[in-house]
């Protein structure tokens, strides 16, 4: 990992705004109506390449993929792991009234599914992790940032958004999530 003794290195974490065309494809995938998975892959690859270049151009030292290929920073795991087929809950954000632009974007979106955990958690699509890595590596090769990293959902944030209806205790749920997600953390 890059270090500096002369200045604070810059980075960020979290989701960056997705291009509208990519957002529409992600929403179609989420709704189960995506017909062209190749178009989604190409759109993610293009968007990640552009956002990495923009970060380099903005002098960000340690860039990320902005989570552009994920429907949500924590809920994407439902597509990669088993055990998330239960009825979910939707949280209502009271602060939306103060941010009408954010509310308007949310209204256009069909929403992100937040199923609950209702079965044993295991990997069902480990290859998706490698796809994310390959897309990011291609973007990094083109833009040549000083350093790059990728995020992964923590067990705590997954447990917060995807409620447990299967494991006997929250501790057991978190421990299982940590054990399974460890493979993504180490990839």
Task: Indicate where each model-derived feature is located.
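Domain-level signal for soluble alpha/beta catalytic cores
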Residues: 1-187
């Amino acid at each position: 990992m890059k270090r500096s003794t002369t200045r604070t290195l810059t980075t960020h974490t979290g989701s960056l705004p997705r291009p509208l065309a990519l957002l529409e494809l992600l929403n179609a995938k989420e709704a189960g109506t995506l017909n062209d998975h190749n178009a989604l892959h190409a759109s993610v690859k293009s968007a990640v390449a552009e956002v990495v270049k923009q970060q380099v151009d903005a002098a960000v030292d340690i860039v990320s993929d902005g989570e552009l290929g994920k429907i949500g920073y924590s809920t994407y795991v439902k597509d990669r792991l088993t055990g998330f087929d239960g009825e979910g809950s939707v949280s209502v954000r009271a602060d939306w009234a103060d941010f009408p632009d954010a509310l308007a974007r949310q209204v256009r979106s069909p929403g992100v599914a937040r199923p609950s955990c209702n079965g044993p958690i295991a990997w069902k699509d480990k290859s998706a992790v490698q796809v994310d890595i390959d897309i990011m590596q291609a973007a990094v090769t083109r833009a040549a940032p000083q350093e790059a990293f990728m995020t992964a959902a923590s067990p705590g944030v997954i447990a917060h958004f995807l409620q447990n209806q299967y494991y006997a205790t929250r501790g057991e749920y978190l421990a299982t999530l940590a054990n399974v997600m460890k493979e993504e953390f180490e990839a």
